């Protein structure tokens, strides 16, 4: 029939039973259940090296996980399944790292996955207390905006998205982006059929490992109403060439659980991009608010530059970027007319980094009724004393906040 679904095979040792409430649904056998019929469930296909007795399930041909391949906290296969032989062993992951490390102006990263309906953030291997306070506050502020736009919760992987309570996940892309580049990276798990069906999911790992019959029935009925029943193939008898009588059927996983059904795809993409644009809009943005020359007489001019970061994020984007020395300070370069002389100040000046509006995110009292203001760390003023006349230019460069220019005229025209 052109589909790879599931096989259910009647077996007194089986772990599953047919639901009494809907014959399509398989439910787990209870510890004290002795009344069959019981079933085993397999992915549709043939058994490898079948000898008439053992029914060995073939290993997945897709054992490599690109999201366990990144250099941050990478671990070998015996410790982290899917990690591959060494970090960045695959051309795809190497290409991503080469792209990002060669572009110093990246201020944020979004990575799209399916499925689950949750927005994830670093770290995977550390609690929030290990993250610099400002970075954590920014992550929470951006995450809250994500919750508003996407309608899904934002969760720390370490605290809320672990497959095993005794293990952490290694070699993850968004961890690498944050720890190596100092950029705030999120992983969006797109689409949740459970949410569409009105099922409340609080534990995003446990729910998919083991959920109630009530929840499964609710999801099954949702696809009956909204997909015309096309998301599930009813079980039918089939003679398997190796083991004989089986039944074929089950969920069409690709466009029910794993991805949105086609008619829901556009809405899902629109939400995802809306948050991506909001995330991008939070980046730092340099602005020259004033650049002028004041004539002091005797061929002297006082040159003044007022510079500001009008973005939400600081020009360094994160504290970790500073700690790991992966971002250069903002640089101001003055361009003087021929024969002009600089008496006070430097032609090239490093001004450090400018805070963004996010500086308030770390304040203890951020409610406006109690807020008492902050220092003007979002702004810088530079002054020079110049002897000479003509056009004076200024260029302000930041790896992550852009480049801005202006000019003024010294002396009478």
What is the role of each PLM region?
Residues 6-11, 17, 29-44:
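Serine/threonine-rich low-complexity intrinsically disordered regions
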Residues 14, 124-126, 317, 322:
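Residues in and immediately flanking transmembrane alpha helices
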Residues 19, 129-131, 327:
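A generic membrane alpha-helix/interface feature
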Residues 21, 83, 163, 202-205, ...:
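General N-terminal targeting signals
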Residues 308-413:
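C-terminal beta-sandwich/jelly-roll accessory domains of carbohydrate-active enzymes
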């Amino acid at each position: 029939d052109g589909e790879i679904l599931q096989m259910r095979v009647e077996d007194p040792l089986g772990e599953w039973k047919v639901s009494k409430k809907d014959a399509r649904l398989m439910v787990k056998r209870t510890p004290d259940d002795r009344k069959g019929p019981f079933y085993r469930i397999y992915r549709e296909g043939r058994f490898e090296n079948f000898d008439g007795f053992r029914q060995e399930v073939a290993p997945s041909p897709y054992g490599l996980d690109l999201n366990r391949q990144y250099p941050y906290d990478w671990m070998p296969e015996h410790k982290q399944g899917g990690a591959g032989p060494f970090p960045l062993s695959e051309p795809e992951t190497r290409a991503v790292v080469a792209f990002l490390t060669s572009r110093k102006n990246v201020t944020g990263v979004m990575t799209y996955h399916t499925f689950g309906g949750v927005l994830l953030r670093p770290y995977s291997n550390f609690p929030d207390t290990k993250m610099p306070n400002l970075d954590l506050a920014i992550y929470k502020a951006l995450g809250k905006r994500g919750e508003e736009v996407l309608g899904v919760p934002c969760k720390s992987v370490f605290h809320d998205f672990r497959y095993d309570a005794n293990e952490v996940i290694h070699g993850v892309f968004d961890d690498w982006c944050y720890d190596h580049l100092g950029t705030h990276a999120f992983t969006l798990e797109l689409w949740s059929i459970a949410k569409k069906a009105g099922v409340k999911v609080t534990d995003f790992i446990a729910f998919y490992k083991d959920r109630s019959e009530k929840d499964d029935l609710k999801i099954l009925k949702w696809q009956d109403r909204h997909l015309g029943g096309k998301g599930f193939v009813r079980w039918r008898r089939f003679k398997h060439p190796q083991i004989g009588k089986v039944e074929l059927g089950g969920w069409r996983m690709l466009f029910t659980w794993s991805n949105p059904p086609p008619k829901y795809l556009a809405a899902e993409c629109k939400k995802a991009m809306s948050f991506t644009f909001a995330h991008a809009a939070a980046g730092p943005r340099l602005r020259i608010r004033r650049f002028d020359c004041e004539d002091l007489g005797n061929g002297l001019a006082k040159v003044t530059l007022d510079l500001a970061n009008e973005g939400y994020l600081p020009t360094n984007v994160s504290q970790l970027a500073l700690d790991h020395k992966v971002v250069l300070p903002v640089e101001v370069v003055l361009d003087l007319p021929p024969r002009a002389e600089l008496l006070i100040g430097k032609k090239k000046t490093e001004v450090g980094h400018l805070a963004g509006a996010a500086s308030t995110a770390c304040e203890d009292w951020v409610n406006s009724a109690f807020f008492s203001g902050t220092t003007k760390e979002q702004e810088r003023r530079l002054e020079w004393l110049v002897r000479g006349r003509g056009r004076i230019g200024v260029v302000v460069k930041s790896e992550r906040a852009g480049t801005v220019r202006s000019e003024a005229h010294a002396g009478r025209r």
